[in-house]
Amino acid sequence: MKKKIISFALGIALLISSLSATTVYAAGEIEVVDSTSYTVQTFPVDTTDITEPLRLALDYCSLNSSENNILTIKIPAGVYCITKTNIASSNTVLDLTEGATILNDCPGRGNIINSPSGYYGYDGLKNFTVRGGDLGYTDENANESTLSRIAHANGVRFENVKFTNGFISHFVEVAGSTNVVFDGCVFDGFIGDLSSSSCEAIQIDILEEYEHFSGFPYYDATMNSNVTVQNCTFTNIVSGVGTKSLFHGYYQNNITIKNNTFTNLTGTAIYCSGYTNCDISGNTITNCAEGINYFMMKSDSRLGSVCDIDNNGTINNNCGTKIYNNTISVNATDEISTASAIYVFGNNVTSSKQNKYDSYAKVGNYSVKNIQIFNNTINTTAHGIRVYDTVNSKIHNNTVTSSKSSGGYGIYAANSSNSNQIYSNKINKFSNGILIASSSKSNKVTKNTVNGTGNSGIVINSGCDSNSIDSNTVMSSGKNGILIGASKTSSVQSNNISSSKADAIHLNSKANVNVIKGNLFNVHGKYAIYCDKGSTANVYVNNYKNSSGRYGYSKGDKKDYKFANLAVPTVTVSKKGTTATVSWKKVGGANDYYVYRSTSKNGTYSYIGHTKSTKFQNKKLKKGKTYYYKVSAVKVANGIKQRSNLSTVKGKKI
């Protein structure tokens, strides 16, 4: 191997004239080796400015490499600078593992290495890897320039590269590319804050000409796909991975962000805008202002910044994303006071919103559909998991803990978040544990454990209909265990509620609950069930045994009353002709009786009528047919229907 010898005196002179006091380089040469490690070409390096020899090496690879002849450019150990952007070549490895550091010293908005421009689709740079070494900036470079920009590429990898000392810019930008991987890289140090920059270290961006990704034609609506960021470390920067930019109706697809570590970020660790089929898993996020943001459309105030590409985009109906097995610790800051560990956002863009914010976003509901959030461990000073306009999704098996019992929500579903399953989560402290708000309907809240909230454990706000709260454990709430606002709630069943300082279950005025049944009450400050004036409910049998008052309470316009369980009627059935007479003894406290019938003993029983007496006649039955009956004792007062369990089945053949 050919070596270029530089005298000691010349080396000293070069160090004094060309380098800062902390910069050194090793004289030698850039080698280009083939897949057998045979050196096929060399380019001398005799100055700290490596721009020209690296360009020559890349040009050589551009002419001589192929899919069957991968060439590797090996940079010798040392600290070098780049003063003009170099263009990467396909089927090439840039190897910095011998200890090379390359610093961006471009006088303008230049970069260390970019993909070539002037391509469509993914037909530009192919099969290019940067391996090892350090990439950063000289102390004098304050040009807010990215270190590397990749577009229209297929098969680009950054392996074990350390990126350092950013200045109000991304470290790497990727747009309109596929099969891009960042593996084992480190991103450390950044000058700037949220007031001057929200830059992600790795920006997985849109290919938009004027504001976001200039200089990389052709702008053909090519979106990123199959981008992976794994095993990387992000420390002491603003934001980690993602983008805040999006086109209406176009989506970045198959984005994987896994097994990374984010520490001491003043912004958001992972920020996804318009991403579909994402795998966000196994990440450790510590002492960051926000954890994971997932936006299908921007919020109202930011609709004006939605970008336009053409009129061919369509609204996504299945985001297909999973956020799981992440460990997240977030601390709210002055800039992000409503910080969330996980924040999911869809938006229904109406014509009035479109006009008001002069937005390119097409009119339509950009809801988040089919996202799964599970097995995450969260500690936060603000919110745990917040979802807006999120539909047909699952939030389950998360452990969500607040450092305080005032302010913030453990799990919050709002803005028409409908038909979601929220189950098997463990929630500690917060103001409210689980809150359903803003016209969110048909959600199932089941088998969650909520402990130590400052206000209520589980809350259904006014206007949120057809939600069910079943089989949850709610402990030590500062106010109510379960609070129902002015909404039509399907059921509150089989919950274990203990040590609420106010009521176990509290119904506000105009609340309407179809079923309150099978709940276990233990030691409450006031009532097991409190029904405010104007509320309505069907209250079946509950376990009041260990409740402080051992009863419920109904507030009325003229009279209040207490209630507990009604006894079950003992039923007999007789017949005369085609009439069956169902009879029972009076049940104490009941003022009405509901009768149900089936033509099969173990079949479905349908309501056939009610009576205030102790006898009910069922007429005009078919001869030779057997009819089966059940009866429930009922007390109706102040809009509350207190019901006993159904009686034992009794039948009669006509």
What are these regions (language model features)?
Residues 39-74:
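Acidic Gly/Asp/Thr-rich repetitive segments characteristic of extracellular carbohydrate-active
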Residues 58, 67-116, 135, 139, ...:
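N-terminal extracellular ligand-recognition/capping segment immediately after the signal peptide
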Residues 122-125, 129-269, 277:
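Right-handed parallel beta-helix
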Residues 55-63, 81-89, 105, 118-120, ...:
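Short, T/G/N/S-enriched strand-turn elements that build extracellular solenoid repeat scaffolds
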Residues 618-639:
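Beta-strand-rich modules
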Residues 82-85, 103-110, 135-147, 167-173, ...:
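Short glycine/acidic-rich loop motifs that flank beta-strands on beta-rich extracellular proteins
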Residues 563-589, 623, 640-654:
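Pro/Thr/Ser/Gly-rich low-complexity, intrinsically disordered linker/stalk tracts
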Residues 133, 161, 185, 232, ...:
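Consensus "Asn ladder" position of solenoid repeat domains
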